Curated annotation (Swiss-Prot):
The active site is at C117. It comes from Listeria innocua serovar 6a (strain ATCC BAA-680 / CLIP 11262). InterPro entries: Enolpyruvate_Tfrase_dom, Enolpyruvate_Tfrase_sf, MurA_subfamily, RNA3'P_cycl/enolpyr_Trfase_a/b, UDP_GlcNAc_COvinyl_MurA. This is UDP-N-acetylglucosamine 1-carboxyvinyltransferase 2. The gene is murA2. Its main location: cytoplasm. It catalyses: phosphoenolpyruvate + UDP-N-acetyl-alpha-D-glucosamine = UDP-N-acetyl-3-O-(1-carboxyvinyl)-alpha-D-glucosamine + phosphate. One of its GO terms (molecular function) is UDP-N-acetylglucosamine 1-carboxyvinyltransferase activity.
């Protein structure tokens, strides 16, 4: 890609940042609309490439999608179970939600194995285990997953690994199955509650979303509805870290503070002043940051998606901080890039030791995945001089209007249009 972000670092940021709808909800809510038989209206969707890719896929299936600003009106009435072995499905990891939704509605689907961020092995074996338990035959042929069922019947499904994707996918497939489904060792993320709320508004019978046991009683038909997406807790957390790194008073609006308890606790431990309101968080200016140890866990633990952005902030902390990722042990690709800027790190197994404080210097760096990109933006804002970040497409997959938002609070950040490439 010839696209790059250019950041002139060292500026103090002040003002208000608005958080958009949750990316990890949006990519499941849009496929979930396939299960309805009339119009579904989704409000508050983020303006990111994954969302537009999903609109294109729904239109390929024969659905109609009208969208304006952050609202989409999806009419799934004329959809057919068209095979999707290649094409748009390969562009995003979350295209696997089409498996559960199409299986639930049509009893069959062909979905090319998805792309998105590369974070080491991310098998979908738990998804497949769930589909098979519901009565589907699943085969992998030439890089595409083929699913077919004469009928779907409720089942008791125990997830061997707590997986957000598998929990949601099994919910999508089970809401129109015959009888009762119980998902045990289910993931508890807020995005799962969001998807369950949409499905319930469509007429599904779901109990226990947000706990480790979800009970679903299948229904024959689901109807359209109105649904407003929850705010993106990872975008909110990223903005909190960014405000602590380079801010002199930044207010972050459209947040649900209970979704952010992990990052709030750690930033408090680091000595960062915060004012927590009902739907906003104010992050004050901080001179000295205390070192802190972090371990990522499934929700409600500290989120793996905020591990990388926080690593950039820890270059400012006094002493050695240890960051351990128990979810994705190989999620440290950003470290080599921040080292180019003068960061001091030591990798030990699934942990990174961050030594500080160091003054980062602008450099040419590359984002290898979405949250690594966020970490490099924070590092670039902290650094003296000019930072060029390549791999912009990764950042734009998950952060909508990032340049406009950061420019509005005083960041000097531009997108190079060297050879404009359509993303």
């Amino acid at each position: 890609m010839t696209n790059k972000l250019i950041i002139q670092g060292g500026k103090k940021l002040a003002g208000t940042l608005q958080v958009d709808g949750a990316k990890n909800s949006a990519v499941a809510l849009i496929p979930a609309a396939i299960l309805a038989e009339s119009e579904v209206v989704l409000e508050g969707l983020p303006d990111i490439s994954d969302v537009y890719t999903l609109y294109d896929i729904l239109e390929e299936l024969g659905g109609s999608v009208r969208y304006d600003n952050k609202t989409a009106v999806i009419d799934p009435a004329d959809m057919i179970s068209m095979p999707l072995p290649t094409g748009n499905v390969k562009k995003l990891r979350a295209s696997y939600y089409l498996m559960g939704a199409m299986l639930g509605r049509f009893k069959k689907a062909v979905i090319g194995l998805p792309g998105g961020c590369y974070l080491g092995p991310r098998p979908i074996d738990q998804h497949i285990k769930g589909f098979e338990a519901l009565g589907a035959k699943v085969t992998n042929e030439q890089g595409a997953i083929y699913l077919r069922a004469d009928e779907l019947k409720g089942a008791r499904i125990y997830l061997d690994v707590v997986s957000v994707g598998a929990t949601i996918n099994i919910m999508l497939a089970a809401v129109r199955a015959k009888g009762k489904t119980i998902i045990e060792n289910a993931a508890k993320e807020p995005e799962i509650i969001d998807v369950a709320t949409l499905l319930s508004n469509m007429g599904a019978i779901i109990k226990g979303a947000g706990t480790d046991t979800i009970r679903i009683t299948g229904v024959e038909h689901l109807h359209g509805c109105h649904h407003t997406i929850i705010p993106d807790r990872i975008e909110a957390g990223t903005f909190m870290v960014l405000a602590a790194a380079s801010g002199k008073g930044v207010r972050i609006e459209n947040v649900i503070p209970t979704h952010l308890e992990g990052i709030i606790a750690k930033m408090t431990e680091m000595g960062i002043p915060m004012d927590i309101e009902e739907d906003a968080i104010f992050v004050g200016e901080v001179e000295k940051i205390k070192k802190v140890d972090i371990k990522t866990y499934a929700y409600p633990g500290f989120p793996t998606d905020l591990q990388q952005p926080l690593t950039a902030l820890l270059t400012r902390a006094e002493g050695s901080s240890v960051v351990t990722d128990t979810i994705y042990p190989s999620r440290f690709k950003h470290i080599a890039e921040i080292e180019r800027m003068g960061g001091k790190f030591k990798l030990e197994g699934r942990s990174a030791v961050v030594s500080g404080p160091v003054k980062l210097q602008g450099s040419k760096v590359t984002a290898t995945d979405l949250r690594a990109g966020a970490a490099l933006v924070i590092a670039g804002l902290l650094a003296e001089g000019t930072t060029e970040i390549h791999g912009v497409e990764h950042i734009e997959r998950g952060y909508s209007k990032i340049i406009e938002k950061l420019s509005a609070i005083g960041a000097d950040i531009t997108r190079s249009t060297a050879a404009e490439t359509k993303l």
